[in-house]
């Protein structure tokens, strides 16, 4: 059996009734991964041995009937630490790095009985929006293998969309969960900053990074967030979890809910078919009883510029630790200490990572700090204030997740600015530390279109409520790419 069309709750019932074992489900999942891997390249490491050991232990202990995730396989983005499983951040720099600890999010998932089946491919050090900067080769879109899957959580999204796994973890610094979720037609949530511990996440932009869940449906996404969210003394930016159950509002109607539609999110640079899809979605929300009104987020247009100064500056600092001395790649042609540093970093990092390190170092350098980094911080505050003004009167914000559907592989690699602009609609959410979700809302040119819902801090349950109401009255989430295959 493949089980790839079974929901988490259906799988849980099969496990509790002992119609299948955790080992059988894990073996089937591993076969799903292997059978699709040549077409997608969505995994860096398939952790077969470790997964089967975990599954056997769960079978021996018995499935927890009160825990819907007990015995359920999970794929983890390759920048999230996993004890005893290679964690490379898809970089030559960390080609041989095997952590001796689990990230808190992974540890939380394991505590719930989840089984880590592998580490998913990604843009190197989470720097990229197409899944093409990986040292291990580009990931392919689940719907069309000549298209990008989005990034940086490319493998995590493609793996869920293709039926390799039901659930996966990604990280989102400027849209890296939501954009690949949109491009692959699944549900991806970037939680409020601090909701999921960053301990064990290989840092890119520390004021922006957040771990979050991928799933085929809204409820399954919320169930995974339930498992991984926690306050953590090991992460000074983590916050108390204010919601006992993120599924609590799923199934409730949205009559009277006020939803804002920013005019800037449907302006210049938005594909006409994407715009039409989002406007149709807005009408659908109105049919469900919500009140949808146009608003303005005037400083959102500066989001990309602000982000690439702040994120690159934080990256240039965070990546200083990779020097060829302590762990990771060390150049063999170095004859002195300076050459070890220079050659190891030059050879170990890919072009996009080096570009961002240089941009960040420049922004922080003497004479340019005030003009760039300090100014970016000031404009970031204006972006936050724009959101606060809107959320004083509205429950949620609605818009497209990305300006277009997935584009051709290798079409923007030589135009980094064009690729950066693809994050135009997701970046402001990270700058403000807000929660945002992408859900399937239609198709254009045979490819999925993602709808983004944004809420004020700690409003994930309201986001899930609205997303689930849309999902329950549409069938976009039920449509699957050819590679998904049948179920038996």
From Swiss-Prot:
Keyword Transmembrane helix belongs to the record: no
Gene3D superfamilies, per database record: Amidase signature (AS) domain
Swiss-Prot/TrEMBL catalytic activity: L-glutamyl-tRNA(Gln) + L-glutamine + ATP + H2O = L-glutaminyl-tRNA(Gln) + L-glutamate + ADP + phosphate + H(+)
Superkingdom as given in the UniProt entry: Bacteria
Keywords annotated in UniProt: ATP-binding, Ligase, Nucleotide-binding, Protein biosynthesis
A cellular component annotation (GO) from this entry: glutamyl-tRNA(Gln) amidotransferase complex
Homology family: Belongs to the amidase family. GatA subfamily.
Chain's role: Allows the formation of correctly charged Gln-tRNA(Gln) through the transamidation of misacylated Glu-tRNA(Gln) in organisms which lack glutaminyl-tRNA synthetase. The reaction takes place in the presence of glutamine and ATP through an activated gamma-phospho-Glu-tRNA(Gln).
Protein name per UniProt: Glutamyl-tRNA(Gln) amidotransferase subunit A
Taxonomic classification: Bacteria, Bacillati, Bacillota, Bacilli, Lactobacillales
Annotated gene: gatA
């Amino acid at each position: 059996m493949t089980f790839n069309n079974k929901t988490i709750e259906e799988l849980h019932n099969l496990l509790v009734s002992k119609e299948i074992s955790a080992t059988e489900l894990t073996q089937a999942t591993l076969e799903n991964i292997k059978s699709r891997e040549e077409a997608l390249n969505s995994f860096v490491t398939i952790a077969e041995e470790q997964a089967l050991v975990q599954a056997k232990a769960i079978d021996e202990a018995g499935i927890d009937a009160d825990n819907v995730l007990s015995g359920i396989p999970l794929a983890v983005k390759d920048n999230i630490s996993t004890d005893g499983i290679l964690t490379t951040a898809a970089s030559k720099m960390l080609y041989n790095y095997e952590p001796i600890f689990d990230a808190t999010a992974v540890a939380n998932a394991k505590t719930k009985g989840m089984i880590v089946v592998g580490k998913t491919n990604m843009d190197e050090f989470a720097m990229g929006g197409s899944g093409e900067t990986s040292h291990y080769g580009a990931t392919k879109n689940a719907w069309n293998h000549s298209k990008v899957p989005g990034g940086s959580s490319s493998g995590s999204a493609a793996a869920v969309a293709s039926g390799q796994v039901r659930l996966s973890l990604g990280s989102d610094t400027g849209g890296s969960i939501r954009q690949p979720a949109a491009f692959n037609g699944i549900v991806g949530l970037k939680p409020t900053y601090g909701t999921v511990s960053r301990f064990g996440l290989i840092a890119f932009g520390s004021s922006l990074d957040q771990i979050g869940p991928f799933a085929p449906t809204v409820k399954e996404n919320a169930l995974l967030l339930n498992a991984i969210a926690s306050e953590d003394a090991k992460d000074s930016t983590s916050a108390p979890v204010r919601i006992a159950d993120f599924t609590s509002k799923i199934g409730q109607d949205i009559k009277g809910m006020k939803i804002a539609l920013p005019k800037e999110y449907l302006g210049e640079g938005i594909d006409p078919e994407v715009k039409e899809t989002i406007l149709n979605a807005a009408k659908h929300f109105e049919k469900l009883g919500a009140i949808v009104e146009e608003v303005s987020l005037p400083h959102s247009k500066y989001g990309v510029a602000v982000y690439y100064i702040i994120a690159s500056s934080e990256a240039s600092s965070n990546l200083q630790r990779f020097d060829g001395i302590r762990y990771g790649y060390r150049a063999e042609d170095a004859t002195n200490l300076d050459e070890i540093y220079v050659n190891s970093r030059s050879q170990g990092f890919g072009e996009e990572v080096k570009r961002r390190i240089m941009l960040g170092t420049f922004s922080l350098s003497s004479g340019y700090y005030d003009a760039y980094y300090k100014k970016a911080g000031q404009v970031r505050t204006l972006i936050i204030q724009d959101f606060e003004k809107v959320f004083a009167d509205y429950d949620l914000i609605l818009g497209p997740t990305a300006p277009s559907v997935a584009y051709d592989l290798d079409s923007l690699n030589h135009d980094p600015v064009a690729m950066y602009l693809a994050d135009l609609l997701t970046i402001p959410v990270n700058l403000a530390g807000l929660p945002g979700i992408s859900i399937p809302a239609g198709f254009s040119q045979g490819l999925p279109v993602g709808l983004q819902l944004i809420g004020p801090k700690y409003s994930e349950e309201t986001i899930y409520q609205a997303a689930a109401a849309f999902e329950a009255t549409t069938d976009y989430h039920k449509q699957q790419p050819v590679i998904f295959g049948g179920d038996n």
